[in-house]
C-alpha cells in the first residue's frame, strides 16, 4: 500500500511547480500544496533574488511563508520541492522545515537546478531539517517510486 503523501513545494520561476505537479500526478491520492511568500520578498531578477537569499541565510532571518493550515502528522511521507539557490534550498523552505519540527513521518526532497551546487543542496537541506527524518534527497523525480512504497 502506498504511503499517504503530501507534496510541498516552493517555486520562484515555475520549474519546481511543474515538477511538483508531475510528481503529484504520479502518486495516487497525494496532496499538493504550494509554499508561498509575500509579494516583494524576492526580486523578479534571478541574481538579485539569489543575493537576497544569501543575505537571509547569513542573517539567519528567513521569510515568512503562506501555507494553508496543514496537519503534517496525517501523512506518512512529505516530499519537499525547491529550486537550488547557491547550493541552498530556497529560503522559504527553511521556514517550512522549522514549522514542521515535531513531524514524525518521513521526508524526502526533490529539487530543480540550473546546474551548480547540487551536492551542497543535499548537505544544506539535511542541516536545515534538524531532527526530522530525511530518507532521501534527489534531483527531479528519479526516486519517487522508491519513496512512496
Locate predicted features:
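Short, glycine-/small-residue-rich phosphate/pyrophosphate-handling segment
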Residues: 108-143
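Alpha-helix N-cap/helix-start motif
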Residues: 89-90, 118
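A short helix->loop->beta-strand "cap" motif at the edges of active sites that frequently abuts
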Residues: 102-106
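N-terminal beta1-alpha1-beta2 submodule of the flavodoxin-like/Rossmannoid cofactor-binding fold
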Residues: 1-78, 87-89, 98, 131-134, ...
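Short alpha-helix in the alpha/beta-hydrolase fold that links the catalytic acid
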Residues: 92-97, 121-124
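Glycine-rich, N-terminal phosphate-binding loop of Rossmann-like dinucleotide-binding domains
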Residues: 82-83
Amino acid at each position: 500500500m502506498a504511503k499517504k503523501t503530501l507534496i510541498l513545494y516552493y517555486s520562484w520561476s515555475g520549474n519546481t511547480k511543474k515538477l511538483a505537479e508531475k510528481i503529484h500526478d504520479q502518486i495516487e491520492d497525494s496532496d499538493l500544496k504550494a509554499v508561498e511568500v509575500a509579494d516583494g520578498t524576492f526580486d523578479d531578477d534571478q541574481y538579485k533574488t539569489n543575493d537576497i537569499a544569501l543575505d537571509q541565510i547569513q542573517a539567519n532571518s528567513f521569510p515568512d511563508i503562506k501555507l494553508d493550515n496543514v496537519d503534517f502528522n496525517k501523512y506518512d511521507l512529505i516530499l519537499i520541492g525547491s529550486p537550488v539557490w547557491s547550493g541552498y534550498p530556497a529560503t522559504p523552505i527553511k521556514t517550512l522545515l522549522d514549522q514542521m519540527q515535531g513531524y514524525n513521518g518521513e521526508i524526502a526532497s526533490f529539487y530543480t537546478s540550473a546546474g551548480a551546487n547540487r551536492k551542497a543542496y543535499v548537505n544544506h537541506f539535511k542541516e536545515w531539517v534538524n531532527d526530522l527524518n530525511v530518507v532521501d534527497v534527489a534531483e527531479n523525480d528519479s526516486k519517487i517510486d522508491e519513496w512512496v512504497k
